[in-house]
């Protein structure tokens, strides 16, 4: 099934083979979501091979927590994940909509803003056995950037109250020429204007065309 907000941003989705991934969320569940999506990605690769679909041009995408997880899948070569879920077939590109790129800095932002009690969802996500510093070191995408990192398109609003725009800047500085950053002026966390949605659609379509023409 297509989640409506993704359907809205992908113009040529009828031409794509689309897989949706679910993952565990909630209090004290870290890092289950990361492991879930990496294992799900391998299942997708295996299914694509079985159905004789191309595995050379896979693009992973997600928004918010899903953006963070899409980046983790794309950068999983550098993630010490010792299990049968490892695969040599990596995504060709990642589309990241306002996902976390540096966990500790995002947590600090939430503590400083604190627009309501318990607004720091990152600390809620972490079990007692995993410190903020450890989680940030291992599960922050910017710490996993390497020479084989895929091309990434990031879409982020400058007025995001949950994942600050600075997170996109950090990734841009780390990925350099492997990164395209689409800044949505005054954009928040979801709920972009119709004009911004149109710009997002156009940029995603261009990014996909550039990705697939190679």
Stretches found by the model and what they are:
Residues 148, 153-156, 160:
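Short beta-strand/loop motif that positions the catalytic acidic residue
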Residues 105-144:
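Mobile cap/lid helix-loop segments that gate and shape the active-site cleft of serine hydrolases
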Residues 2, 6, 19-57, 194-199:
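Catalytic nucleophile-loop/oxyanion-hole region of alpha/beta-hydrolase
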Residues 42-110:
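Primarily recognizes the serine-hydrolase "nucleophile elbow" in alpha/beta-hydrolase
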Residues 165-214:
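C-terminal catalytic histidine-bearing segment of alpha/beta-hydrolase fold enzymes
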Residues 140-149, 166:
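Conserved serine/cysteine hydrolase catalytic core
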Residues 103, 159-163, 190-191:
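Acidic catalytic loop of the alpha/beta-hydrolase fold
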Residues 22-26, 100, 187-188:
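Short beta-to-alpha linker loops that shape the active-site pocket of alpha/beta-hydrolase fold enzymes
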């Amino acid at each position: 099934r297509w989640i409506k907000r993704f359907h809205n941003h992908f113009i040529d989705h009828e031409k794509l083979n689309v897989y949706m991934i679910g993952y565990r969320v909630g209090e004290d569940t870290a890092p289950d979501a990361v492991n879930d999506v990496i294992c799900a990605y391998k299942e997708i690769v295996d299914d694509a091979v079985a159905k004789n679909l191309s595995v050379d041009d896979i693009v992973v995408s997600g928004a918010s927590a899903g953006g963070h997880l899409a980046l983790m899948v794309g950068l999983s070569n550098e993630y010490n994940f010792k299990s049968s879920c490892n695969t040599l077939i990596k995504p060709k590109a990642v589309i990241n909509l306002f996902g976390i790129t540096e966990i500790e800095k995002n947590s600090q932002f939430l503590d400083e803003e604190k627009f309501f009690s318990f607004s720091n969802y990152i600390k809620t996500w972490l079990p007692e056995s995993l410190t903020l510093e450890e989680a940030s070191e291992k599960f922050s995408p910017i710490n996993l950037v390497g020479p084989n990192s895929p091309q990434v398109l990031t879409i982020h609003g400058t007025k995001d109250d949950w994942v600050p725009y600075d997170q996109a800047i950090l990734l841009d500085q780390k990925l350099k020429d492997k990164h395209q950053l689409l800044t949505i002026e005054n954009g928040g966390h979801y709920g972009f204007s119709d004009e911004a949605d149109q710009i997002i659609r156009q940029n995603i379509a261009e990014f996909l065309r550039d990705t697939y023409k190679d």
